[in-house]
Amino acid sequence: MNKTLLKSVREYKKQSILAPILVILEVLMEVLIPMEMANIIDIGMTSGDLHYIIQRGVILVVMAMLSLFFGISAGNMAAVAGAGYAKNLRHDIFYKVQEFSFKNIDHFATSGLVTRMTTDITNIQMAYMMSIRLLARAPIMIILSWVMTLKYSVKVAILFLIVIPLLGGTLIFIAKKAHPHFIKVFDEYDILNNSVQENVNASRVVKAFVREDYEIDKFHGISKYVYTLFTKAEKIVAWNSPVMQFTMYVVILLLVAIGGTGIIHGTMGTGELTSIIVYALQIIGSLMMVTFVFVMIMIAEASTDRITEVLEEVPEMQDKADAVTEVKDGEIIFDHVNFSYAGEGGNLSLKDVDLHIRFGQTIGIIGGTGSAKSTLVQLIPRLYDVTEGCVKVGGIDVRDYNLEALRDQVSMVLQKNVLFTGTIYDNIRWGDENASDEEVQRMCKLAQADGFVNEFPAGYNTQIVQGGNNVSGGQKQRLCIARALLKKPKILILDDSTSAVDTKTDALIRKAFREEIPNTTKIIIAQRVSSIEDADQIIVLDDGKIMGVGTSEELLKTNDIYREVYESQVKGGEDDE
């Protein structure tokens, strides 16, 4: 467990400290119990002193009760500390991910983050809970049991001094041999989770292409490999128990031999031999405990590295101390912008983009697949940072803004529309959680969503399930547009967000934009010329470069790319969807 992860203990420090203290008290009682048993046998029973037997018996029962109390209390404290620690870790990772830029998120697969927040944190929780309890218990038990053994027999104590390091070393060797296999197992868990996630998310595609058998075989292959790796690790760990059992029986035989000789010669009592055997079992049991915890820590170590990787990831975008907190207007300037997803030295996705968009204008962006249309607009709310040049909003470099303030004034409807589990009201209110029902309904009317929403039996209280699988693609797009409008932003970006909407509805949405939100800068990325031909300016992108800027009429005269797209759609006819 490293310093980064231990910071998440926070309010559970008290339980984390009390658990080992209670364990030590429990161990103290357990170590004293065999001594009292020896006294009862060797003194009370030998002399036939019933009063002594009862007196010591009462003390024995009290010790047992105290041991039980301390043990239960320690277990409760350890459970609370472990569960609380895991809760804090999940919170810290989730909070950290919220701070990530797109570039940070690109470092981790979604399935990898899910595995970290579930399986990995559970492993760490178990290791932490065992560590604060068992790692305190085992060493104290071994030391005190050995000291008590030394009190009765130096020979037996020396025997333990030989056995303990040999056995401990063997068990640690076994655990270390298993560790690399556990690391591989958890790496494969990511792949397994990714396979499940892909299959569930794309279940309709799988069924449409009748690929169920292929997906089953793929999942079976990954699952079998995880099974093979885990089996290899467990086969190594399985040596623990036989080694411990063998050692235990050998030690007991030696103890009986040494103790029997002592009893015959009168140098050791029967009770003392009984106590020594109990101490031997306590020492061996403690070594087994240490090994078990050590194996768990080995498993958790792989998880620790993966969790630490997320927590120590430095968010690429951080607010300056004097960050600007107010966006004046929706004017946008791209000043000789170059951008590469790989950073400096990588292949440029945007090349020397120089652009001025006035506040309140409607801008259309068109270009072929891979021309960096989405990349261009993602720089405006600073989802990525430019590699060279700068992007200004309201006359200020976006890097000088407080991120929350900037993004609060930029509404973006992404290509992949996402709705969340909850009612339609809940989903639209992502734009403004304090919005009234009337405001939500008004924005849905602007987005041409009000009609189909009112056709649902529950209207705006209709539950959205599984990311919006109970609404059509066009309906989902309109709900996402309504959500974006509810923010009342200074800049509205539609990234191919009306592609599943028929041309008539598309035209009504654009008309609503012109009439109802004239003081919002609107950027519309589209594949259909009809979606942008009435824009104030149209930007033609090709391979990350601006190949033309102007109205539809101007571009038809001066730009071959735009003219080719326009003519192919007009002559071919646009399909109403």
Question: Residue spans of the language-model regions?
Answer:
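Juxtamembrane helix-loop junctions of ABC transporter transmembrane domains
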Residues: 21-22, 29-42, 50, 54, ...
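Helix-loop-helix
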Residues: 48-55, 144, 148-162, 232-306, ...
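ABC-type nucleotide-binding domain
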Residues: 326-577
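Short intracellular "coupling" helices and adjacent cytoplasmic loop segments at the cytosolic face
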Residues: 47-48, 83, 91-115, 119-121, ...
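Hydrophobic alpha-helical transmembrane bundles that constitute the permease/transmembrane domains
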Residues: 20, 24-32, 65-72, 124-127, ...
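Transmembrane helices of ABC transporter permease
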Residues: 11, 15-28, 60-63, 69, ...
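Membrane-integrated ABC transporters
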Residues: 1-30, 37, 45-60, 74-78, ...
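An intracellular "coupling" helix at the cytosolic face of ABC transporter transmembrane type-1 domains
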Residues: 11-14, 99-103, 119-132, 136, ...
